[in-house]
Amino acid sequence: MMQLEVILPLIAYLLVVFGLSVYAMRKRTTGTFLNEYFLGSRSMGGVVLAMTLTATYISASSFIGGPGAAYKYGLGWVLLAMIQLPAVWLSLGILGKKFAILARRYNAVTLNDMLFARYQSRLLVWLASLSLLVAFIGAMTVQFIGGARLLETAAGIPYETGLIIFGVSIALYTAFGGFRASVLNDTMQGMVMLIGTIVLLVGIVHAAGGLSHAVETLEAIDPKLVSPQGADNILSPTFMTSFWVLVCFGVIGLPHTAVRCISYKDSKAVHRGIIIGTIVVAILMFGMHLAGALGRAVIPDLTVPDLVIPTLMVKVLPPFAAGIFLAAPMAAIMSTINAQLLQSSATIIKDLYLNLRPEQVENERRLKRMSAVITLVLGALLLLAAWRPPEMIIWLNLLAFGGLEAVFLWPLVLGLYWERANAAGALSGMIVGGVLYAVLATFKIQYLGFHPIVPSLLLSLLAFVVGNRFGQPVPQPAMISSDK
């Protein structure tokens, strides 16, 4: 059953998104094509930086998967979600300044540019590019599934139709607007998410008959829902440590977060970004997860936990308002996909194609065409991948997240802070981290009860230090030639 009152605000929202992308295309006159298309000519201020980092970091799993888990495991999961609070501070604090200064010095546009300038190894860049593409395709498929599920539940649009509407609109606006469109949309989407979260939470508390009544109802359903350990006693110390490493500390190693650290304007922007970003993450994480947990008092018998937020929207808000705030999780999903789509197309063009054919760097018309075409083709592949979705998407997302962290975290952090780090060390760290994570995650091996990310990062660090012994010191990093 398609609901027009819900669909109309959504159409209006998509039009705003396209409007911002057209504006971004018009602005695209300054600087060279690569710098502008993939980095917005490094011109982000504090508020925009905070919003784009937050919107990129907060994805379908925070708006759909996370509240779904809170619905299933109770208030303990809300507490667990707050572990993510320092994520913005960690990524901007540890990478931020140093990363941006070096990126400007090397004239780097992508993360792999930074890795090449630092370690000067082609093999390392190829390995990094391939692992990035594989993991991103996994992560973006999750976002596509999330978007289509949302339209299916809240607006009554069939899953396949929703998937097509969703996929086509994202691929188009990312392909033509580039990084500037992505960042402008993130800022607008961050605002929508904030307002949407607060209104929805108020609506749920009201529908449950007040906060204390909601908690009593949860206790009646299952006393474990209001205990710190959560239902099924899932929140053990090892689980919480693993979760913190995966979604907070490890975020430093996520390529689409790291590239946001290259593209801001000045150090005032970073300081402001850290403060605003942390506040926004706090409100969104607490609000959405609490909404999911308390939602069980309003709708106790959902079979697919991932559907909790869209179902609640339709239940506790009037249809028109539901349409407006359906835009909030849509925003979360879109902002994450466009960051990852851009990163993937940047990887294919800059790190693979221009490495093989460096003479093409001056051919801006061809690069423009290729960027758009590659983004659209990736969009089409993702549509195919998302056609038959699994039941709970949070695990699929965490799988892709962990793979990226296992490969990129140490080469990035040690490359910035350890002068003697060399290519042999970075390569051994990447290979050990990536392979170990893939094996542990595929066969669901949890050593001492830890998530695969914990042993993978520890052994990857060890492999880095040992491998470093056998490598040559890296010569002084060079400027990347001809605005590559």
What residue ranges belong to the model's regions?
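Membrane-embedded helix-loop-helix hairpins and adjacent transmembrane boundary segments
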Residues: 1-484
